[in-house]
UniProtKB/Swiss-Prot annotation:
Biased composition (Low complexity): 166-177
GO molecular function: DNA binding; protein kinase binding
Source organism: Saccharomyces cerevisiae (strain ATCC 204508 / S288c) (Baker's yeast)
Xref: Pfam families: AMPK1_CBM
Protein known as: Cruciform DNA-recognizing protein 1
PTM annotation, UniProt: Cleaved in the vicinity of position 160 to give an X-DNA-binding N-terminal subpeptide and a non-DNA-binding C-terminal subpeptide.
Gene encoding the protein: CRP1
Composition bias type Basic residues, residue spans: 127-151, 451-465
């Protein structure tokens, strides 16, 4: 048997420093055992102390915030060369006995964990009195609760009996639900079980080990029953990516130039087979062109048809018969009037040409069946000269037209109830009246019928015919 002696001893240091470390002969003065700071602020640690003999001592020292120092609460010993250490003897260790039933905490440096030793002697009378009072209060509360519960249970039983009498059942058939009637669970003997044994679920050895549990470990690998029949497991091919891309790109580029000329040749071959346009198609185009030219003139005249014609002003009535009588005018004014007359004659000539074209189109393009008519012979020079030299005939026709016009205007004046003329008509009359006076005395006799035919009233006569 070994002669070593071992005791548990608690080393302490008062509160104040941040870190306290214990070192000594047990660790060859390396400073490896730090003290634990308690709730009070002091530092403590409990550790086993070994002694070889009864006369042997345990030498130690404290390192407080990096400074080696000795505690005054322990015995001191002077070593050679002026070094001072704390030490413990066997008598100091025997006084501190270990608590029965306590266990050590290795994380806390060997501190004890257990109930403190109970002090000898009887307990105090004050504690007994307090315990008795508390017990009496608890009993009284329990009695009150029990009486309330009994009353409620009796009332509920009476109600149940009344209901049973109505429905034909008794309370004997009903099972009790109170705590007293519930059976207790059978106690299990824990001592019979071995400390190291655990409950393990039974394993079905007949199941295939290849199949995996889908609930715990997921779906797992799939094992095919016939892997030899699947091509993907046996066939392996090595494909060069560059060669494959070059081959595919060449195939895509080849059809582009070939597809172009084939389409063009088919179009060029089929183009002469199209039917040529007939003559009536060309004529319809010309008619549409002429209609577009006449539309602005028709739009300018339509508002005059809808509106009732006002009574002619006295200025207009006087200017029409007196157009032939022109007084001599000075040279400067006469030149200006001649220029204006030429500009108006150009406009009137253009309107005549448009009207002649419209008449020709109406005569040529009709829906009636075409009959071969004798072509009109062109007029000779003599006939044209006779037409020009007979202004008297044209004057007689104009007088008849004026008389008819006067009768129509009188009828319209009665219906219109003396309505005033619009601003547009007054402007047209005032502008066109001096045009007839600007004619020179030499050419007045020959050009009077042309002006009257193309005047404002001449257009109105054509529309009312």
């Amino acid at each position: 048997m070994s002669s070593e002696l071992m005791f548990n001893y608690t080393f302490s240091w008062p509160a104040g420093p941040k870190d306290v470390i214990l070192t000594g002969t047990f660790d060859d003065w390396r400073g490896t055992l730090p003290l634990v700071k308690t709730a009070k602020g002091n530092f403590e640690i409990t550790m086993p102390v070994k002694l070889a003999n009864k006369d042997d001592t345990f030498q130690f020292k404290f390192i407080v915030d990096g400074v080696w120092c000795v505690s005054d609460s322990y015995k001191k010993e002077h070593v050679s060369e002026g070094i001072e250490n704390n030490f413990l003897q066997i008598t100091d260790l025997v006084e501190t006995q270990e608590v029965a039933g306590a266990s050590r905490i290795p994380e806390a440096g060997g501190l004890l964990c257990g109930k403190p030793p109970r002090s000898a002697g009887p307990p105090s009378t004050s504690n007994r009195k307090k315990n008795k009072r508390n017990n009496k209060k608890r009993r009284s509360k329990l009695k009150k609760k029990s009486t309330k519960n009994n009353k409620k249970s009796n009332e509920s039983l009476d109600d149940n009996e009344e209901e049973d009498g109505v429905t034909g059942t008794t309370t004997e058939d009903v099972t009790g639900t109170s705590r007293e009637e519930t059976p207790l669970a059978e106690p299990t003997n824990v001592s019979k079980e071995a400390p190291g044994n655990f409950h393990i679920l039974p394993i079905d050895q007949s199941a295939d080990t290849t199949q995996s549990n889908g609930i715990i470990g997921g779906p797992g690998p799939v094992l095919v029953p016939n892997p030899g029949e699947i091509k993907e497991f046996t066939e392996i091919r090595d494909v060069d990516a560059r060669e494959l891309n070059e081959r595919l790109n060449k195939k895509e580029e080849v059809p582009e130039p070939v597809a172009g000329p084939i389409v063009e040749s088919s179009v060029t071959e089929k183009s002469p087979a199209l039917p040529q346009a007939d003559d009536p198609i060309v004529e319809t185009k010309e008619v549409a062109h002429n209609v577009q030219e006449l539309t602005p003139q028709v739009e300018a005249v339509t508002p005059l048809i809808n509106e009732p014609e006002p009574l002619p002003t006295p200025e207009a009535q006087i200017s029409i018969p007196e157009s032939s009588k022109v007084e001599p005018v000075e040279g400067s004014l006469q030149s200006k009037l001649v220029e204006k007359r030429e500009s108006t004659e150009g406009v009137l000539d253009g309107s005549k040409k448009v009207e002649n074209k419209a008449k020709k189109d109406e005569e040529v393009f009709t829906l009636d069946p075409i009959v071969n008519k004798a072509p009109k012979l062109p007029l000779t020079d003599e006939q044209t000269a006779e037409g020009r030299k007979s202004p008297a005939v044209s004057e007689e026709k104009e007088k008849k037209k004026k008389q008819e016009k006067g009768s129509k205007e009188v009828k319209r004046s009665e219906t219109s109830k003396e309505k005033k003329p619009s601003a547009k008509e007054v402007k047209k009359q005032t502008v066109k009246a001096p045009k007839k006076q600007t004619a020179s005395p030499l050419s007045s006799s020959t050009e009077e019928p042309k002006k009257k035919k193309t005047g404002f009233f001449g257009k109105l006569k054509k529309l009312f015919k």
